[in-house]
Amino acid sequence: MGQSGAPTLVIRIDDLGALHSVNEACIQTYRSGIARSVEVMPVAAWYPEAIKMLKENPGLDVGLHLVITSEWENVKWRPLTHCPSLTDENGYFYPMMFPNPAYPGQSIMEQKWDIKEIEQESARR
């Protein structure tokens, strides 16, 4: 609630780094005064451009977007480190978290992921 007691709308920008067009839209949304915070995706292809844009817009609050799925067909994400228990045969994250009968074997929960491997990979960073 705002100071007047009226509800307050908070808008958070999402997926910075995903695509060039997403980066442009995120920064435009911030510069237009619509939002003041963004989530950046370090695993995304346009992450380097996103970092450059963030440096040019120091007033933008930044958070990390945790990515462990890669649901789009033509845009894929993969881990920053070697973590094969979370990836498919091509090294990309699985497209969904939970099983879907229409897409057998395509969820993380159907795989034999190794928490020790994940912990070791995260400790390297």
Question: PLM features: what roles do these ranges have?
Answer:
Residues 8-10, 35-37, 59-65:
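Structural preference for beta-strand elements that scaffold enzyme active sites
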Residues 14-16, 41-43, 65-71:
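Active-site beta-loop-alpha junctions enriched in small/polar residues
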